[in-house]
Amino acid sequence: MPAPGIFHVCWDGKVPLTYRPHNNGEHHDPTKNQTGSRLVYWRCDSRKRCWRGDYHDQGANHWIDDHIATPMSKYRDYEQSRQSFGINVLGTLIVEVEAENGQTGFAVSTAGEMGCFIVEKHLNRFIEGKCVSDIKLIHDQMLNATLYYSGSGGLVMNTISCVDLALWDLFGKVVGLPVYKLLGGAVRDEIQFYATGARPDLAKEMGFIGGKMPTHWGPHDGDAGIRKDAVMVADMREKCGEDFWLMLDCWMSQDVNYATKLAHACAPYNLKWIEECLPPQQYEGYRELKRNAPVGMMVTSGEHHGTLQSFRTLSETGIDIMQPDVGWCGGLTTLVEIAAIAKSRGQLVVPHGSSVYSHHAVITFTNTPFSEFLMTSPDCSTMRPQFDPILLNEPVPVNGRIHKSVLDKPGFGVELNRDCNLKRPYSH
């Protein structure tokens, strides 16, 4: 069992900290190393914004907060900005785990101070003292121990995901292998990406295979809203040409009737797919939308589904692509299981963003022919790592691609930026 530790922590209402048990100085066979939990609440003080663990927490004039349709858009007070209803309040959670030999693994998600509390006061008991390879055991214990308050995902699952990813990172570093090799190795030489952002035309110039735009209108806007978003797609089709993929991200903001009308309004412009039109649990709605969507247009969802069971039910609706976020769905351990469910039904699994935490998974999946890159620059004109500045050495696509050799570093191949202000609101 690791010796008692010291925590360095930081909290401003939205950022993460670091807990680090002392190394007891002993040396062990790496395969027998035990892990001590390390929780990181990282934050940047109010005078210097250092966001991006929570990529929604951006500054003014950023495309990601510019009149994007949401479930709250029907309330005029919260229509213009997603930050107005609090999309950025959770903040960043960083979890670190340390083996007895002093090696550490870490991961990033969104759960903020509340996630820190869950790890420190509850989940730590399932981590400390375990072998670094006991990832599935720890994962199962965390899931079952939180059933009585986790519901169908959300904050608790974000936290569990972060712990799981940190454990995979540590395991890879202990054995000296990239995570994708721990999963069985790459099935292709490179990952090709589409870009999510407001400017698919710029994404095309950067070498991406497609561009996914947010919708700006919803059912409360009636047919006028449908026409406005269809005009946006038509305009981008003219700019990008016929062969470039165009997709729409509806972010849970629609109902079946509106989504069906929007899909048909965009069909003349060769829309490749329409994404997450409905709230997560409206499975019958997704089934109906898929049944009535234009021929050749895919229906996709999954970003805000939080359990393996919810993905199994979603798969049964017949949608074309499932899109879990590895930082929210239960971690890499669950993502692998989701990919297997999708594969058994002939469906694709294309995770939502998540940078290296997705890269190491999707390059091993035979049913992930492409992946998502989230444009985090304010106007989508430059390439910026999703988790900058928290992660160091975070790769970005070159000409829309990342070669597997870029991932050939132990663990997830990134380091925690210790220049970010690290604090801890809780101890155990």
Swiss-Prot record:
Substrate binds at H56, R82, E372. The record marks E372 as: Transition state stabilizer. Binds 1 Mg(2+) ion per subunit. GO terms for biological process: amino acid catabolic process; carbohydrate catabolic process. Its cofactor is Mg(2+). The keyword Amino-acid biosynthesis does not apply. This is L-rhamnonate dehydratase.
